[in-house]
Swiss-Prot record:
This is Large ribosomal subunit protein uL30. Part of the 50S ribosomal subunit. One of its GO terms (cellular component) is cytosolic large ribosomal subunit. NCBIfam families: rpmD_bact (TIGR01308). PANTHER family: LARGE RIBOSOMAL SUBUNIT PROTEIN UL30M (PTHR15892:SF2), MITOCHONDRIAL RIBOSOMAL PROTEIN L30 (PTHR15892). HAMAP family: Ribosomal_uL30_B. One of its GO terms (biological process) is translation. The gene is rpmD. Keywords: Ribonucleoprotein, Ribosomal protein. The lineage of its organism: Bacteria, Bacillati, Bacillota, Clostridia, Eubacteriales. It comes from Acetivibrio thermocellus (strain ATCC 27405 / DSM 1237 / JCM 9322 / NBRC 103400 / NCIMB 10682 / NRRL B-4536 / VPI 7372).
Amino acid sequence: MAKLKITLVRSISKLNESQTATVRALGLRKRGSCVEQQDTPQIRGMIKKVEHVLSVEEI
């Protein structure tokens, strides 16, 4: 299964509560932080919800 490198490129201070919770559930805390996640439909759905603050690359 492929992996995704997810980077938080914008601040989460202006996001609503559910979007902030989604970013936290992805494992991101501060602007500029990166995580690697499995490429699953659940992760893709979370990315789509907050795609305007993320950068995503396939590994």
